[in-house]
Design a protein with these regions (language model features):
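Generic recognition of stable, solvent-exposed alpha-helical segments in well-folded globular domains
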Residues: 52, 56-59, 128, 152, ...
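Terminal peptide-recognition signature
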Residues: 21, 26, 86, 104, ...
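C-terminal extensions of enzymes
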Residues: 38-42, 201-276
Length: 276
């Protein structure tokens, strides 16, 4: 895109990437996991378009699998053990999602992702789709929920069989002074933290909480000092990683339901207290 006064002129150059070039780029990056080429239709797209989109994604996946096998066989490939994950799509149409899950499950991939969620639909719609789709994905392969989400979203996803997640929330929200705690999300830009000498979270072992107060981090944010954003991001990443450790421990101990209930009650209590 090229900016011209107050309008934007769209370049006529073809910026799209085909299946093989996508695989080659990921192979050269030598990532542990490569994601198959897919199309993510809008959550409000009409049914006919979504069906055509999903059919196209299925064809692309077959090509991706063949190309990844070829790349992994080459002598100069960096990571010959690179894994390939297929991506389930279908917007908010349960039946299309389920049929697509069945189709890609037959391809015997290394893992499976659920994509196209957290793109405008409600949390309830997202959970409805997960309830419908996850049972049709191989139970002996890892399942990845793409682009999700809040701590509560993660707890709901794990309960429905999701194994891992990725999301910009910890870093993006941290850059805006929003930090996650056991009692919900805090906005350190709020004036009530101006003289608050407590750490972001009592008992937290992250560098931000060990060495800095809410008031000082707020001062850094207000002064547009990069350190303020960095400290918020550090805390959020620590919070998310620590929560995932606790989730794994709860699953191993067989008490995830109790852990989830405790966590959600803490988040809800924080919402109530923040309004007082």
């Amino acid at each position: 895109f090229f900016k011209q006064k107050t309008a934007y002129e769209i370049s006529t150059r073809d910026w799209s990437s085909d299946v093989c070039s996508s695989d080659l780029i990921q192979s050269n990056l030598a990532s542990t996991i490569a994601m198959a080429f897919d199309e993510c239709p809008s959550s409000v797209a009409d049914r006919d378009y979504v069906q055509k989109s999903v059919d196209r994604t299925t064809r692309w996946l077959a090509r991706c699998k063949a190309e990844m096998a070829r790349l992994n066989s080459l002598p100069d490939t960096i990571n010959k053990e690179q894994l390939l994950f297929g991506i389930n799509q279908g917007a908010v149409y349960e039946d299309i999602r389920i049929e697509h899950a069945k189709a890609i499950s037959e391809m015997d991939l290394d893992g499976y992702a659920v994509g196209g969620l957290a793109v405008g639909e409600t949390h309830e719609e997202m959970y409805r789709i997960l309830d419908a789709v996850v049972p049709y994905l191989p139970q002996n392969k890892p399942t990845y929920l793409m682009g999700v989400g809040t701590p509560a979203n993660i707890l709901e996803g794990v309960e429905r069989g999701i194994d891992f997640f990725d999301c910009v929330y910890p870093s993006r929200n941290g850059r805006h002074g929003h930090v996650y705690t056991n009692h919900g999300k805090m906005n350190l830009f709020n004036a009530k933290y101006e003289l608050d000498t407590r750490p972001i979270e009592e008992g937290c072992q992250c560098p931000a909480c060990q060495h800095y107060s809410r008031a000082y981090i707020r001062h850094l944010l207000k002064a547009k000092e990069m350190l303020g954003m960095r400290l918020c991001v550090l805390h959020n990443l620590y919070f998310y990683n620590h929560m995932m450790e606790e989730i794994r421990d709860a699953l191993d101990a067989g008490n995830f339901a109790e852990y989830k209930k405790m966590r959600l009650e803490g988040f809800e209590e924080g919402k109530i207290n923040s309004k007082r």
